[in-house]
């Protein structure tokens, strides 16, 4: 049995589907929605589904640092006899943009662990979907700064491999797409796929910050804007890890869009 936290999100949902297709007994966990309802900020709510679990996928929300303690959740996993944990972290930990406290809790747990460090998500483009549907317009900061956006499906498939195969124990994987792409280029890809013109507006950092603060804590907003606007070389580099684990190249932004074009029509 494999337990998936954050099971309703852009990574959790395809991860549940991938594992189920592989014949695994999957227990989806989220703060609301289908499956077992639990909150990592209240680790005891997770305990009822851990008996007999061979692995757990841990996904924390952006505000988790202010609300919870991952060491406490890891303690519940350890007490429940869970042997393996896979943590969805961030490329920003490796480039010292984000704190390593969650990774430290996992690597010091005494469990088998694998850490996934994805870069910019292709699915962040969902944030433009409503304005594209209703106004054929989108806005983004740093219009011509390119990052190798990763398809959440690739993250899910790498996570599935790590959850099932102990050969991935004590590994840290940086997950990116196959090529860097800027917001302006993403807009062009969406426009071409829809077959209709899309008006692109470049936001200032201050404008983007004001919007992001409505759904993300300030430290996360600032570090995210730093990555988007002034990425370090490592943050713009294409990682070989998706292909290393899956035996195939990572999906392109166009691949992701093709599967999700309905959201933009």
Named regions from a protein language model:
Residues 28-33, 39-40:
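N-terminal Rossmann-fold cofactor-binding loop
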Residues 38-54:
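Conserved Rossmann-fold cofactor-binding substructure of NAD(P)-dependent oxidoreductases
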Residues 59-140, 147:
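Glycine-/Pro-rich loop/turn segments that contact NAD(P) or position catalytic residues
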């Amino acid at each position: 049995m494999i337990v998936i936290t954050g099971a309703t999100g852009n990574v959790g949902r395809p991860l549940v589907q991938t594992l189920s297709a592989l014949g695994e007994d999957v227990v989806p966990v989220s703060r609301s929605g289908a499956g077992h309802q639990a909150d990592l900020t209240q680790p005891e709510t997770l305990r009822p589904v851990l008996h007999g679990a061979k692995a757990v996928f841990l996904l924390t929300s952006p505000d988790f640092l202010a609300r919870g303690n991952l060491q406490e959740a890891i303690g519940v996993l350890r007490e429940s006899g869970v042997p393996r944990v896979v943590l969805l972290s961030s490329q920003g930990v490796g480039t010292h943009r984000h704190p390593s406290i969650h990774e430290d809790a996992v690597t010091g747990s005494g469990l088998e662990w694998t850490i996934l460090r994805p870069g910019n998500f292709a699915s962040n483009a969902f944030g433009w979907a409503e304005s594209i549907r209703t106004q054929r317009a989108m806005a983004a900061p740093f219009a011509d700064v390119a990052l190798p956006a990763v398809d959440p499906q690739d993250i899910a498939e790498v996570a599935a491999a790590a959850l099932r195969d102990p050969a991935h124990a004590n590994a840290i994987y940086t997950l990116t797409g196959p090529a860097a792409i800027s917001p302006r280029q993403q807009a062009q890809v969406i426009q071409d796929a829809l077959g209709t013109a899309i008006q692109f507006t470049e936001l200032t950092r201050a404008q983007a910050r004001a919007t992001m603060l409505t759904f993300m804590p300030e430290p996360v907003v600032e570090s995210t804007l730093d990555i988007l606007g002034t990425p370090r070389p490592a943050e713009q580099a294409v990682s070989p890890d998706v292909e290393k684990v899956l035996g195939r190249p990572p999906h392109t932004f166009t691949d992701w869009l093709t599967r999700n074009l309905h959201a933009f029509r």
